[in-house]
Amino acid sequence: MSDHNTKVALLILDGLGYGKDDNSNAVKAAQTPFLDQLLATYPHAKLNASGEAVGLPEGQMGNSEVGHMNLGAGRVVFQELGRINKAARELVFEQDPTIQSAFQYAQANHKKVHFMGLLSDGGVHAHINHLMALCDAAKTAGLTSEQVFIHAFLDGRDTDPNGGISYVNALNEHLQQSTGTIASAIGRYYAMDRDNRWERVQEAYNLLTQGIGIPSEDLLASIKESYSQGVTDEFVKPIVMVDAKGKPKATIQEGDVVICFNFRTDRGREITIALTQQEFPEYQMKPLSLHYVTMTAYDETFKNVQVIFQKENLTQTLGQTLAEHNKTQVRIAETEKYPHVTFFFSGGREEEFEGERRILIPSPKVATYDLQPEMSAHGITDAICKDMVAHQPDFICLNFANPDMVGHTGVFNAVVQAVQTVDGCTQKVVETGLENGYSFIILADHGNSEYMINPDGSINTAHTTNLVPCILIDKRFSHIKDGKLGDVAPTVLQLLGLPKPEEMTGDALAY
């Protein structure tokens, strides 16, 4: 069945799932003549992109990191969330050598311990249960609430935009029988930037190291005050907890222990760089000498950062398999999703494979993407159309970020525009590709834009557990089976006429 001249393009419409036919669905509200035509003309299927099908706990929504990892690996990749949940449940933190040596260092040197990360049960970047387990481990190790401090990054993106209060309440309740004192809070917009907006990171750095923020003796009251001004969790300005004399309860000082409990790597990197790796004189940020620990390996090049859970290396991913068969490949995305089509799609590998090229189109510099819902989709489209004609790479992995990134803003009309932009851009890419001998697999990595409004009328900014579409354009195959994201790489190899490595346990879906 193989035709060795076949070339395959995988188009990932990020965050575009199957939703209900109602007014919560921005995909349905959008004019998508091209996608409608594809669904009417070509074989298509539904893929599972959440929960155990992608290596997450049952019922856990998918996300881009997990999605691209499964897409590229061709198997179910068991995710950090599942591993760390198990460790937290089984009290592994109380014996973990990295955590215990950090606690022992703090005790021996009379230093503070700071737990820092996203206060949320979204399970995308972090989980409040992991923080609670760390607090319990600190208590078991003999540390007190005068030694252990928590710097909470508020979510509102993978969770309800006004959910921060309930997480602070849950944490406070837990701390009554555990160890730890909340020292500060700030929206993830500042503390968890991933787009080199160092002026945002600076707000978090100044809060953490100097206690610069809105002074507060009552965190819940301060967050409620923020809500009353229309500022939701994600964007909450720095809040510093102070004592009766107005002095910050704790800031990160030279020699302290910092444990960053976010397990997803991409949004933990910049604050870690500022605190430990690199000076930014123009933002008055310089690294401190810290005993710094991260839940997972944020970056292999970081110096003097200890890691609790090392990455399990994935071999024989799609990228590696293509390279071993001397195939050329292109990975293309805008800044927001560039790590996903490169690092995550390659199973956690930073460097290119032999025959791989990468095209990065900068994301627009706007405060939030509802202000520019087309993002950089047109730039991606122009670049890949030129590349298909000029270089004819054997495989293309392309990501359109719009339905996800604009979906996270919760601005319904902007999401509609985002989806319409992607429909038009997909048309140009497919038409150019068909003229140049490409087959296509068009799918999403998880849902988001198809569910924008909750039953109570409130805005939903988070991902979903919905199934995602998978459209096959290849004249040799008239059918495609339902499956999971981990079945996509074997299907790409099937279209290319290449054997599937035994590490890829997913199934080829075309027939």
Task: List PLM regions with ranges.
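Feature captures the catalytic ectodomains and active-site-proximal regions of enzymes
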Residues: 1-511
